[in-house]
């Protein structure tokens, strides 16, 4: 019974995160509309609230294309795995009710975010294009350098909170 409740809580958390990201992009589009002195996405429904759902429908109905010489399976699995990792990181965040109790939640966060490097590398490699491979390797180097500084800042905060 506890497993079913944690599964329902996890699914509810994932749905809430995805919907909140959709509405944050709506907020971003509205702010950009005001900054650029043009009409933002206020025309659909009441204050543009149905706009994220229309965008989701548009994204799911787009035609799926892939490069001719690419590795088909890894080309499509790597972005899905990246999305899965970014949603999996939310499981260790302490909310009103903890879904999963981790003693080493910070280490789990660093491990999950560092796995995202492999998805970028596999996505660049699987397209069988030299330019995509070089772009993927540049993104890997940049991500690793940012993760080192993130880990050092996190350990510094942890160290000063214990003193």
Curated annotation (Swiss-Prot):
Alphabetized UniProt keyword annotations: Electron transport, Membrane, Mitochondrion, Mitochondrion inner membrane, NAD, Respiratory chain, Translocase, Transmembrane, Transmembrane helix, Transport, Ubiquinone
Localisation per UniProt entry: Mitochondrion inner membrane
Class of this enzyme: translocase
Pfam families: NADHdh
Alphabetical list of PROSITE patterns matching this protein: COMPLEX1_ND1_1
GO BP annotations, alphabetical order: aerobic respiration
Catalytic activity: a ubiquinone + NADH + 5 H(+)(in) = a ubiquinol + NAD(+) + 4 H(+)(out)
Predominant place of localization: mitochondrion
Membrane spanning residue stretches: 3-23, 77-97, 104-124, 143-163
Membrane topology, from the record: Multi-pass membrane protein
GO-annotated cellular components: mitochondrial inner membrane
InterPro entries cross-referenced by the UniProt entry: NADH_UbQ_OxRdtase_su1/FPO (IPR001694), NADH_UbQ_OxRdtase_su1_CS (IPR018086)
Gene Ontology molecular function, alphabetical: NADH dehydrogenase (ubiquinone) activity
Enzyme nomenclature, EC number: 7.1.1.2
Described function: Core subunit of the mitochondrial membrane respiratory chain NADH dehydrogenase (Complex I) that is believed to belong to the minimal assembly required for catalysis. Complex I functions in the transfer of electrons from NADH to the respiratory chain. The immediate electron acceptor for the enzyme is believed to be ubiquinone.
Family: Belongs to the complex I subunit 1 family.
Name of protein: NADH-ubiquinone oxidoreductase chain 1
């Amino acid at each position: 019974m506890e497993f079913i409740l944690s599964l329902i809580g996890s699914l509810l958390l994932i749905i809430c995160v995805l919907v909140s990201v959709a509405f944050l992009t709506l907020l971003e589009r509205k702010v950009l509309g005001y900054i650029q002195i043009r009409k933002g996405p206020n025309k659909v429904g009441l204050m543009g609230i149905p706009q994220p759902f229309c965008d989701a429908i548009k994204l799911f109905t787009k035609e799926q294309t892939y490069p001719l010489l690419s590795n088909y399976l890894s080309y499509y699995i790597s972005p899905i795995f990246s999305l899965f990792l970014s949603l999996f990181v939310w499981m260790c965040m302490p909310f009103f009710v903890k879904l999963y109790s981790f003693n080493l939640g910070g280490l789990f966060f660093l491990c999950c975010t560092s796995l995202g490097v492999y998805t970028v590398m596999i996505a660049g490699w699987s397209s069988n294009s030299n330019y995509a491979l070089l772009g993927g390797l540049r993104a890997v180097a940049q991500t690793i350098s940012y993760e080192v500084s993130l880990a050092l800042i996190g350990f510094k905060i942890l160290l000063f909170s214990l003193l």
